[in-house]
Amino acid sequence: EDERRVGCLLHPLQNGGRDLRGVSFYGRELCDGHFCPSYHYISEVEKRSLIKILDSWYLYGLCVTDIDLVKEYFRLVSDGIGEMPPPGCFERPALRDAAGRFFSLKTTWPFRSSSVNRFGKYYFDGSQYMIRPIDYERLGVDKSVFDMIFLSLSSEFAGGEEVKEAEDIIRSLIDDFIRLYRREGGSFPVEEEMKTETGEHG
C-alpha cells in the first residue's frame, strides 16, 4: 500500500522469475546494468508531482520515461506562475486535473504519427534509434516554441494549419493550469520528505 512508484514491469521480480526485459526497447543487458535516464534527469519534485497527478500506472510509465515532456511542462508552467509548483498543490483536484489533461496527451494526441517504429521523439530504422525532426520549412511555418513537446508526442503534421492547431491545444492546457494556480493561491501542503531534503523543519 505504501509502494507508490512503478518499477520495471518486465523485471523477473514482477513475473514469477521470468525475465521479460528482452522485449523492451533497450534490451535486457542495458536494463540490467543501468538506471533509466529519467532516474537522473527528472527531479525529485517532478517525480513526486507526477505521482500525485497520474492515477494510471500505464500513463505514469509513459510520462515518467519521457524526460523532455516532463521537463518542458514544468518549465512552462513555472515560467507562467513565477515558481516551481510544489507537489502538494496537486492534492487540489482542479490543479491535478488540469495537469492530468496535459499528460493524457500521451495517449490522446490527435497528431500522433501512425508509424509503428516511432517511440516518442525516436524512430527505429532497423539498426538504431534516431530523432526525426519536424520539417517546419516544408510546412511553411517557423519552428514551434513547443517543438520538444511535439517530438515527445510523436507528432506528424500535414500542414502549417495543423501546427497552429497543435500549438493552440498545448498553449490552452498550459494557460489553464497557470490561471487555476493563481486562483487557488495560498500555501500548499509540503511533504515531510521534501522538508527533510530542503532542510526545513517545523
For the regions a language model picked out, list residue spans one by one:
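Short loop/turn segments that flank or connect secondary-structure elements
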Residues: 2-5, 10-202
